[in-house]
Amino acid sequence: MSDNDTRPTDAEVEAELKGVPEDMIDRTSDNDELAKLREELETARQDVLYAKAETQNVRRRMEKDVADARAYAATGFARDILSVADNLSRALESIPADLREDDKFKNLVAGLEATGREIEKVFSSHGIVRIAAMGLPLDPHQHQAMIEMPSADAEPGTVIQELQAGYMIKDRLLRPAMVAVAKKPD
């Protein structure tokens, strides 16, 4: 062995291994071992890349779930409050014109109308919008046909009466509009 090369020669290694049982001697070369280590390293790199990708996918999914939860958190409450808005609207519609002009009822009517406007404003601020229905073709994704009525004025399949207003919350249906649809007269 030279001073510059501290690695033992093959002859020195063979001399050292004399007397050691054959099944205990590792005869793999450095190249084989290096190739095996490189393969293990590549496998580990792939595993790390897959783990990173999975982590990113989980993070994106969680961010979407959180965004959806924020956007649609009021859905249950909004459905419940729609009946209040419906009843207020019906109450206003049921007040006869002569009572609306009566001094005794003017303030009451004005208060009910202001409450209706406030409900619409709150709905709007939470992304809740009324679905357009009157005069439009029936859209099964937004309208629920309750009855068909003969009509000479409207095309068959056109909404001619809104029985109950429908609402969307952001891009999701909160409640379909209950409508009457035109059909050909008999």
From Swiss-Prot:
Q: Where are the transmembrane segments?
A: none
Annotated Gene Ontology cellular components are: cytoplasm
Cell inner membrane: is it a keyword of this entry?
no
Which Gene Ontology molecular function entries are recorded, alphabetically? Answer: adenyl-nucleotide exchange factor activity; protein homodimerization activity; protein-folding chaperone binding; unfolded protein binding
Residues in coiled coil: none
What keyword terms does UniProt attach to this protein? Chaperone, Cytoplasm, Stress response
Please describe what this protein does.
Participates actively in the response to hyperosmotic and heat shock by preventing the aggregation of stress-denatured proteins, in association with DnaK and GrpE. It is the nucleotide exchange factor for DnaK and may function as a thermosensor. Unfolded proteins bind initially to DnaJ; upon interaction with the DnaJ-bound protein, DnaK hydrolyzes its bound ATP, resulting in the formation of a stable complex. GrpE releases ADP from DnaK; ATP binding to DnaK triggers the release of the substrate protein, thus completing the reaction cycle.
Q: What name goes with this protein?
A: Protein GrpE
Organism of this sequence: Novosphingobium aromaticivorans (strain ATCC 700278 / DSM 12444 / CCUG 56034 / CIP 105152 / NBRC 16084 / F199)
